[in-house]
Amino acid sequence: MSTLSYVSPDALKGWLMESPNEISIIDVRDYDYEGERIPGSVRIPSDTFLASVDQHVDDLMKKRSLIVHCTYSQVRGPKAARVLSEILRNRITESKEKLSLSQKEKLFQNLPTVYILHGGFSAWKRRYGGQQGLIEYD
């Protein structure tokens, strides 16, 4: 399994401005979700992540980058990112189609890159809380 990388709030903002349709942001906050989120993010709470993420996998596989975060991205965000990365890889290895090793490798190379938001939503809010359009409210 590949090593997961972190992305800074500044880099994520750039991606959102340049190519918002190529990324998905997955918010795994639970009890600490207070109705504020990064624009366009999908909320899949960590306490139901394993049971819920599969319904999103087909859409997520169409993206270039997936960014996972919780409040601080210290425990839940990284854990969900590892699980998501494994689920995406398993989707290829468990494919019902008979694929050659080279075909599977090509599919692996085209999987979205899974990132963890450095500092989590807390860092995002601290950096962009006062800027129009960078936080959505329920």
Swiss-Prot record:
Primary subcellular site in the record, as a coarse category: cytoplasm
Keywords, in A-Z order: Cell cycle, Cell division, Cytoplasm, Hydrolase, Mitosis, Nucleus, Protein phosphatase
Domain Rhodanese residues, every copy: 19-133
Coiled coil: none
Location(s) in or outside the cell: Cytoplasm; Nucleus
Known outcome of mutating residue 73 to A: No catalytic activity
Gene Ontology cellular component annotations, sorted alphabetically: cytoplasm; cytosol; nucleus
Enzyme Commission (EC) number: 3.1.3.48
Molecular function as annotated in GO: phosphoprotein phosphatase activity; protein tyrosine phosphatase activity
Enzymatic reactions: O-phospho-L-tyrosyl-[protein] + H2O = L-tyrosyl-[protein] + phosphate
Active-site residues, as the UniProt record annotates them: 70
Any one Pfam family match given in the protein's UniProt record, by short name: Rhodanese
Enzyme class: hydrolase
Record's function text: May play a role in DNA replication checkpoint via regulation of hsk1 or may act downstream of hsk1 in an S phase regulatory pathway.
Family: Belongs to the MPI phosphatase family.
Protein name stated in the entry: Dual specificity phosphatase ibp1
Gene that this polypeptide is encoded by: ibp1
